[in-house]
A protein has these predicted regions:
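ADP-ribose/adenylate-binding Rossmann-like module
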Residues: 141-180
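Conserved S-adenosyl-L-methionine
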Residues: 69-74
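N-terminal charged helix/coil linker that caps or initiates catalytic domains
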Residues: 1-52, 85
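A structured beta-alpha segment of the ubiquitous adenosine-cofactor-binding alpha/beta core
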Residues: 100-153
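Single conserved hydrophobic/aromatic residue that forms the stacking wall/gate
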Residues: 190-200
């Protein structure tokens, strides 16, 4: 586990303002603050950080909720889909009153109910080659919760160009994957290859 208080310094420069913790923050996040891996320095980094979530579906909805509850200062969400009844069984950020509404609007509403101090930026559109760099550029970290390979490779390419860490997650049935790319000059998604085949 990478302690939050050792994350890259660029996370503290989100929005070009270094926000300190106030009394409300100390009460809200006291369980975080009590952990040596986070503490007050780590919580300040979370407050001054920004994360873009690509997708507000099954994986994205849970990730967005936990990020907002943890104290991420600015959250971006890009998704062009609407809430359907069949989503509600797993996409826990949405509820029955949001049926037919944009997932981005539904997610933003729920974030602000959970943590009104979070700055939320929504993009109700599909991520594509024309908007990907502009969408990603102002966020510290990108969390890819999309459900198709075209978007995944597009996000990866943009993160390489912009030197952004990429959290890559996927879920199918009872299995899931989680990886971090482009952090501290490690591999990117496109550099993963099949394991070396052993020969006799």
């Amino acid at each position: 586990m990478i302690p939050v208080n050792s994350l890259p310094e660029r996370m503290e420069r989100s929005n070009s303002v270094n926000k300190e913790l106030n009394e409300d923050d100390i009460q809200r996040y006291k369980r975080h603050i009590s952990l040596k891996e986070i503490g007050i320095p780590g919580q300040i980094k979370l407050k001054n950080s920004s994360v873009l979530f690509v997708g507000a579906g099954g994986l994205g909805s849970s990730s967005i909720l936990y990020a907002s509850a943890a104290g991420i200062g600015r959250i971006g969400i890009i998704d062009d889909d609407q809430v359907e009844k069949s989503n509600l069984q797993r996409q826990v950020i949405h509820n029955i009153n949001e049926l037919g509404k944009n997932k981005t609007d539904s997610a933003a509403k729920r974030i602000l109910e959970l943590n009104p101090n979070c700055d939320v930026k929504i993009f109700t559109e599909r991520l594509n080659i024309k908007n990907v760099l502009q969408t990603i550029k102002d966020f510290d970290i990108v969390c890819d919760c999309s459900d198709n390979f075209g978007t995944r490779y597009l996000v990866n390419d943009a993160c390489i160009i912009l030197s952004k860490p990429l959290i890559f997650g996927s879920v199918q049935g009872f299995e899931g994957q989680l990886s971090v790319f482009n952090l501290n000059k490690n591999l990117s998604l496109i550099h993963i290859s099949e394991p070396t085949r052993l020969t006799c």
